[in-house]
Amino acid sequence: MNKTVYTYDVWDTILKRHCLPSYTLEVSLYWLLLYLGKPEKHKDVYKKVKALESDFFNRKEEYFIEELIVGILIENNLMNGFCNNSVTAAWEQIYYFVERNCTYKNKEVIELIGSDYGDKLFISDFYTDSSFIKKLLHHHQVSVLDGVTSAEYGVSKHMGSLYEKIELLKQRKWIHTGDNELADIKMAKRAGAQVRLIKSKKKKINKLKIKNDYERLAFIILSFSLFILKTSRKKKCNKIYFFTREGVFFKKNFDLLLNQIPNIFPSITTEILPISRVASLALKFNESDEFLGFNDALTQYGYGVSTFLSFFHLDDCYSELTTKYHDVNDLLSHRNDPLVKQLIKSIEDKKKRTENFLTSIEFDSEPSIIVDIGWRGSIQDNLMSRKNNYIQHGCYLGLFDFYPGQSGQNKSSVIFDNNRFRQKWTMKGVAFMETVFNALDGSVVDYVNNKPKRKENYAEIENSKHLIVMQDAI
């Protein structure tokens, strides 16, 4: 005796979504455009996809979504050097990831499937092949692991034609289950099925409400991480350096983001670069220059001798110079002074130590992006003063006004940029974030034997327990 054939609709029958169906397509397109380094084109591409889908629907034609998307990308010159197969493979990985995380089993139908005895198939009006549905059902541990889609046959349930294409349904008792009164009830009945209607309950789409300051800060960090990733793709850089201190926390969260999104960026690597303004400023040393190459720093922080010495962590070694000379102009006008000569030699030696350290870690082995909390990006300026540097861009949480003569090129920020639009809260805001996002391993002040030398802040160490609790909460 032939077994009964049981067929099931997939969407809103076997599987339900936590979101609107269009959302999975929109989000997947965003990740695909990010993969291509064109995230700014996301909205335009989404509109074109929806318009083309509408055209297919009006013509009563079926399609594969990946072919439709690749066609739009080619037509709009958005492939960015990637071949069709690479983009299709990336799309399939992204879309499966999104649907896997946005769907859940319909308990009512799963119980029904478990009690049905016979051959079981899914029949879906959908724009992928059946292997995609099989993979998704397998992930959700649904026992219906074979079936067909409208895209594969070029006809749909809504028109009734898809049922006619399935030989197994002929000459057998057939029971179909679904939620759509036209496609799953009327058309299935017309094709000879007994039918079971699954009434879909309208589910309210929950909007995320921020409950506390930790969640507010978490969204800031998440947006910063996404900003870094977007910059990496735009600049075609797979190496990302996070500066010490706040960078330790930023890297931890960026790595977490990479682990929670589609695995389409396997070439991206992240490292902590032990660096600081004090450790890097000597890179600008130029003995033939009037101010030894440090005019930018002097413009920012003043011409006091003690301030100048602090640039290089040499204030204790050369404290005598603070009383001997009125300011840096006075100091550098006496270069024949043995102590001033010794100071200049100390700065030159520090430059060599910093350069040797960067060479030892192969800092310039490939194009890179650097990440820091902000202020004005002076560490980036110091690093980029080297002839053969490979830094392509600097990503910052926020940027203050650049001083006259300071470069604003290759720098961008995610929260604010006072060079474009002034925000009154920024000084307090960044200072607060600098405290909350800080690391407790001390500030790098020099390099000894190609290893960073650090200066500990005992006040920070005393508050370390509170800081760790806050960072874990974020």
What are these regions (language model features)?
Residues 167, 201-224:
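Flexible inter-domain linker/hinge segments
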Residues 157-184, 368-369:
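Conserved Lys-Pro-Asp/Glu-containing loop-to-beta segment of HAD-superfamily phosphomonoesterases
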Residues 84-138, 147-151:
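Substrate-recognition element of Asp-dependent hydrolases with the DxDx(T/V) motif
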